[in-house]
Amino acid sequence: TNQASVPPAIVALCAKGIVRDNQGGAMLLPTLAHTMIPRHEVAVFSGPSFADEVFSGLPAALVAAGKESATKAIQDAFEGSNLRVYRNTDTVGVALAGAMKNVIAIASGCAVGLGLGDNAKAAILTRGLSEIARFSSVLGAKSDTVFGLAGVGDLALTCAGPHSRNMAFGMALGYGEAPSGQLAEGSRTVAALA
């Protein structure tokens, strides 16, 4: 489609990950989206939620990160009796935390699959959160983001059990099984960070 014929729109980016750029470096998905659709306003929509629970009417809280106009539009469109949408300007922090927690969930799942116990899982989560905070600091993200819904909240949910694709992927690896079904987002992020 000719992009000039598409009116500017607000894009709520729900995917989480880090990809390789053309120079072999790493790029957050919002940065990639800005390069691919520069006329559109891109915001990151993330946080601790499983879509099936939200659709079932169970309570959840998410973060919309981006420019004020975009986050307000997302909040107005999605907030309801069971979903609270918080607004934030820290696109980098929300995107980075969302991507990195998937890698940590895979590692946590591996620990479960290998039978390493809850102590090892707790160590992986804690040290993983430390890594998210370090990367966030280097990239200019806000520390509040790391310790909010998009960071700790999403990390806790994603590492809670096999309902998470990334956790299930890691568990399968730990059990020595070939992961089945859809490839977990975190596996691509691992490759981009390697």
Regions found by a protein language model. Give the residues of each.
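Amphipathic alpha-helical segments in well-structured domains
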Residues: A26-P30, L125, L129, N166, ...
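Alpha-helical elements of the RecA-like P-loop NTPase motor core of helicases
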Residues: D52, K72, M167
